[in-house]
């Protein structure tokens, strides 16, 4: 269920301060954040965020297509190593 329109999008205050200073100074440095829950706003387009995935910071360059999504959507937290091979099937092929 989406967030109510009268409430508006959620962005952490500390992250918005970083974005405002970066835009005002036209600073293109990577902005490090743990705020995966923050919504991407149009002011953030063109900035690069280092979003924490629980282990490390994943660089995310914000484009126009990402507006309205959450920062955490672009920093996966789980790694997929594939399913284990079936040992019985391998033994039968010999």
From Swiss-Prot:
Signal peptide range in chain numbering: none
Its cellular-component GO annotations read: cytoplasm; small ribosomal subunit
The segments labelled Disordered in the record are: 72-94
Q: What Pfam families does this protein map onto? A: Ribosomal_S19
Q: Does the keyword Cell wall biogenesis/degradation apply?
A: no
Which Gene3D superfamilies does the protein's record reference?
A: 30s Ribosomal Protein S19, Chain A
- GO molecular function: any one? structural constituent of ribosome
Record key words, sorted:
Ribonucleoprotein, Ribosomal protein, RNA-binding, rRNA-binding
> Which biological processes are named by the entry's GO terms?
ribosomal small subunit assembly; translation
Biased composition, class Basic and acidic residues, residue ranges? 83-94
Give the record's family classification.
Answer: Belongs to the universal ribosomal protein uS19 family.
Give a short account of what the protein does.
Protein S19 forms a complex with S13 that binds strongly to the 16S ribosomal RNA.
Name under which the protein is recorded? Small ribosomal subunit protein uS19
Its lineage reads: Bacteria, Pseudomonadati, Thermodesulfobacteriota, Desulfovibrionia, Desulfovibrionales
């Amino acid at each position: 269920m989406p967030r109510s329109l009268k409430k508006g999008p959620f962005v952490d205050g500390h992250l918005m301060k970083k974005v405002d200073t970066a835009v005002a100074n036209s600073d293109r440095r990577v902005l490090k954040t743990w705020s995966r829950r923050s919504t991407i706003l149009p002011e953030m387009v063109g900035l690069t965020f280092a979003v924490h995935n629980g282990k490390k910071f994943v660089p995310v360059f914000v484009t126009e297509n990402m507006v309205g999504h959450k920062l955490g959507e672009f920093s996966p937290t789980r790694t997929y190593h594939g399913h284990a091979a079936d040992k019985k099937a391998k033994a039968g092929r010999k």
